[in-house]
């Protein structure tokens, strides 16, 4: 699943091509995603200008003349900017054409993504209004994490992936950040002290920024809007490296399951 770095890479690429452009045509080939794509978008969107493209958590927000188009990549979604004459392929479900002869194409083999319209205050959308802070913002700091973890018996990894506490951190980057912080993913969140929380917040921010700089992680489906893969997977400390030597101490990387997700860690480096 694309996590925050991959969605941010997508946003930056799309913004270069689409911000300020006027939508000319909408094509819906398969409306069946996580929620059905409204056929009303075919008449509603043409003529509207895309004023800005923002990101909230893993949602892409296209601020248009009369509302906001919301996109989520789901498990396998991908957005490409292509010439409008490019023939569609299997799993290409939605096209948004603009006034420079280009289009935004939404491809989603597993169809867990979403394309929604909201004409009110975007902060009040039901999918967005209860989200936690952005992990790269000043609102997410050591004191915030320390406060949010008090009395929690859930593992710190599960808390990091709770979108009501902090957004955008998926399985890959939770594993990597916990290794960088030297904290076991199995530790109860409420057991962390203030110093550990500060160290973990710093590791989360550093890991996400490094991933964005590397173009994100391309393990299965992800490419940026021009079709280029990311390379952060080449820098993984523990994720996907079970049974291999820890790059820091030589101990074999361990693997377990937490909440239906694979967890990777070094028992020597992480406590």
From Swiss-Prot:
BP terms from Gene Ontology: base-excision repair
Chain positions of all zinc fingers (FPG-type): 237-271
Catalytic activity: Hydrolysis of DNA containing ring-opened 7-methylguanine residues, releasing 2,6-diamino-4-hydroxy-5-(N-methyl)formamidopyrimidine; 2'-deoxyribonucleotide-(2'-deoxyribose 5'-phosphate)-2'-deoxyribonucleotide-DNA = a 3'-end 2'-deoxyribonucleotide-(2,3-dehydro-2,3-deoxyribose 5'-phosphate)-DNA + a 5'-end 5'-phospho-2'-deoxyribonucleoside-DNA + H(+)
GO molecular function: 8-oxo-7,8-dihydroguanine DNA N-glycosylase activity; class I DNA-(apurinic or apyrimidinic site) endonuclease activity; damaged DNA binding; zinc ion binding
Signal peptide span: none
Cofactor: binding details: Binds 1 zinc ion per subunit.
Presence of keyword Metal-binding: yes
Active-site annotation: 2-3, 58, 261
Short name of any one Pfam family annotated for the protein: zf-FPG_IleRS
Listed EC numbers: 3.2.2.23, 4.2.99.18
Family stated for the protein in its record: Belongs to the FPG family.
HAMAP family tied to this protein: Fapy_DNA_glycosyl
Subunit architecture: Monomer.
Function: Involved in base excision repair of DNA damaged by oxidation or by mutagenic agents. Acts as a DNA glycosylase that recognizes and removes damaged bases. Has a preference for oxidized purines, such as 7,8-dihydro-8-oxoguanine (8-oxoG). Has AP (apurinic/apyrimidinic) lyase activity and introduces nicks in the DNA strand. Cleaves the DNA backbone by beta-delta elimination to generate a single-strand break at the site of the removed base with both 3'- and 5'-phosphates.
Name the record gives this protein: Formamidopyrimidine-DNA glycosylase
Organism of origin: Nitrosomonas europaea (strain ATCC 19718 / CIP 103999 / KCTC 2705 / NBRC 14298)
Gene name of this polypeptide: mutM
């Amino acid at each position: 699943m694309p996590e925050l770095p991959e969605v941010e890479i997508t946003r930056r690429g799309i913004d270069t091509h689409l911000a300020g452009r006027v939508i000319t045509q909408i094509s819906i080939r398969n409306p069946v995603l996580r929620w059905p794509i409204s056929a009303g978008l075919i008449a509603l969107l043409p003529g509207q200008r895309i004023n800005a493209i923002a990101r909230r958590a893993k949602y892409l927000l296209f601020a248009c003349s009369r509302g906001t188009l919301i996109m989520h990549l789901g498990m396998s979604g991908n957005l490409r900017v292509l010439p409008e004459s490019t023939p569609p392929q299997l799993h290409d479900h939605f096209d948004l054409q603009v006034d420079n002869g280009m289009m935004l194409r939404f491809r989603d083999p597993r169809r867990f993504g979403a394309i929604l319209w909201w004409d009110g205050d975007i902060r009040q959308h039901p999918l967005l209004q209860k989200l936690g802070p952005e992990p790269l913002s000043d609102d997410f700091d050591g004191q915030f994490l320390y406060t949010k973890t008090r009395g929690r018996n859930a593992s710190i990894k599960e808390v990091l992936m709770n979108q009501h506490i902090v957004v955008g951190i998926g399985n890959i980057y939770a594993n990597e950040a916990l290794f960088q912080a030297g904290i076991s993913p199995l530790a109860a969140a409420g057991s962390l002290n203030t110093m550990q929380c500060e160290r973990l917040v710093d590791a989360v921010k550093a890991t996400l920024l490094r991933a964005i700089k590397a173009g994100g992680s391309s393990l299965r489906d992800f490419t940026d809007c021009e079709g280029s893969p990311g390379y952060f997977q080449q820098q993984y400390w523990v994720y996907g490296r079970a049974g291999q030597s820890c790059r820091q101490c030589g101990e074999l990387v361990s693997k377990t399951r937490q909440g239906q997700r694979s967890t990777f860690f070094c028992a020597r480096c992480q406590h």
